[in-house]
Amino acid sequence: MLRETLEQLFEFVAQHIPSEQIMMAKKEYQKTTGEIYEDDKSYNSRMALFLEWYLLDQYEPGTRQTVLENIIEDNSSSWTPDRLESYKDVSKNIQALFEIKKVRDNSVTVLDLFTDEKYQIEEEDSKLAFRKNDIFQGRIVPHNDKYFFTGYFCFHPKKTQLYIKGEAKKFYLLQRSWKKELTKLEKESSKIQKLYLKNAVSIEKIKTKIERTDSGTKRDKLTGKLLGLKEDKIKIEASSQQTGKEIGHLKLEKMKIEGRSLISELINKLAYMNLKWERSRQIDVSDIYRN
């Protein structure tokens, strides 16, 4: 079913997006993956990987949405709920370098080398396609509380595993630093919200006291306190807005956009190395997979 959904999306791209735009994207893609020729053994799978990249990793100029996210937004009113839901599932895909940890008859357990998270993937006849410790480029898509492969892969030779894991770890460490920063900002935001609530309660108490007092002197003192609390409220609100902006920037610009870009860049670089190896088997693979 997922393969059919992707084929529908590929067909939609072919019918509704100008061919010049797709050709420009292909040239951009091939800057890091190498030019694809029809006589390459992996031509079909690499073309599918390009279309996945175009739909799922390429951002529309001037937006913070991928091509697929824009397509969904533009057509949400004309598609059936089921179709819309299946496309939204695809937009939530996880692209990674995966390592096979366990192979069962109809599922595999994989480790995402970028996040160190494990996933159980539903996959028919998995023992025919995967072996334990395989490392490969792929995407998984969530659907009905399960995960599925998109079906397009780039498997890397066993001798390259040490190099690939070293490259993936660089991103893992960067992402971990972003998560630590996010946790710190979220704690700060929580602290600010508590201050805001405490300030609001204090303001209401002072207002009640002012209403109940008959003493002019006491009322003046309470009014002064109220003004101070209102000034504090303005400062707290400003801090809350600033922290919210920092959290939003970190989540969108760093963790989503820059994170996806760095993952895509590394995966495409490795795919190009794999293509060189495919074309030149007489060269030792360790002379290809290197910085």
Model feature map: region roles:
Residues 149-165:
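Short, compositionally biased
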Residues 117-122:
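A short macromolecule-binding patch
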Residues 139-146, 153-155:
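Short, charged beta-turn/beta-strand-edge "cap" motif at the junction between a beta-strand
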Residues 17-101:
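Accessory interdomain/linker segments of ATP-dependent helicases and helicase-like nucleic-acid enzymes
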